[in-house]
């Protein structure tokens, strides 16, 4: 199995459940070049990991991080944030 195979449509942003449990879940996210995961908040702490590609993560507190394969960012609860794909990218979000 490969994470790329989880996204069958060429949408700018695609998300699909990778793993669910009572204690948390993991979501596979694909962002195409120029695609943007719109501004939103999370109610719980989260971890975003870049598996492939390059994205820019930003939040309303002024944090701006370029994520390359192997890079990650901790996402604070109740803080608006968004992600833009510099090139086609594969990410994993753990909550």
Residues covered by each model-derived region:
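Conserved short histidine dyad/triad with adjacent acidic residue
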Residues: 12, 25-42
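Ligand-binding loop in jelly-roll beta-barrel domains
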Residues: 77-95
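Histidine-centered metal-chelating micro-motifs
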Residues: 36-37, 72-73, 78-82
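A short, N-terminal "cap"/entry segment at the start of jelly-roll beta-barrel domains
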Residues: 1-27
């Amino acid at each position: 199995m490969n994470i790329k195979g989880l996204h069958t449509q060429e949408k700018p942003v695609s998300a699909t459940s990778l793993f669910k449990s009572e204690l948390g879940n993991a979501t596979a996210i694909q962002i195409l070049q120029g695609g943007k995961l719109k501004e939103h908040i999370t109610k719980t702490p989260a971890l975003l990991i870049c598996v492939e590609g390059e994205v820019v993560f930003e939040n309303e507190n002024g944090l701006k991080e370029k994520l390359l394969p192997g890079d990650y960012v901790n996402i604070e609860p109740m803080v608006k944030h968004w992600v833009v794909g510099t090139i086609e990218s594969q990410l994993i979000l753990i909550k």
